[in-house]
Amino acid sequence: NRDLMVENGNLYVLKNAGIISQIPMDTTYEESEAYEGVPFVQMILHGTVEYTGPYLNLSENMDKTMLHLIDYGALPAFCWTNSDYTPKDVEKSVLYYDNWTSKSLDVYESFNSVFSDLRNARMTDRRKLQEGLYRTEYNNETYVYVNYTDSDISYNNMTIKAGSYLRVN
């Protein structure tokens, strides 16, 4: 029975976790030509236990965070409150549930329609193909290309739109 949700869980609790919240999507080291982050934890967990990345409504750049979620096979997540108050600053307004109902529903439905069949698939590879273009491979012969750049990229007779992704089966 895996009904437990954990945040940044450790190995000891994984056997009981149904979902892990807030898995880091970046590295603590500065990336360079000599060092680039690898989604090692995500590659081990994907298809075994579900996980989320950073809360989308708390992200500085929601579009880039969504691309990271797609690239790393993570589910979208939001952090809200339903307190009855008038937000006094931006941070509190991004936490207020009513401000996000429509947007979050769109995000969840979009992710579910495109990626629901990958939730149980194993992530078998993820590599940088060129600057700003990454490919994640799954054991069901699915490839997800993510373009982090501001320009469309042509690769192997495909075009991956700027700031977008392309799923290929």
Task: Locate each region found by the language model.
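Active-site-proximal substrate-binding groove within the catalytic cores of carbohydrate-active enzymes
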Residues: 1-169
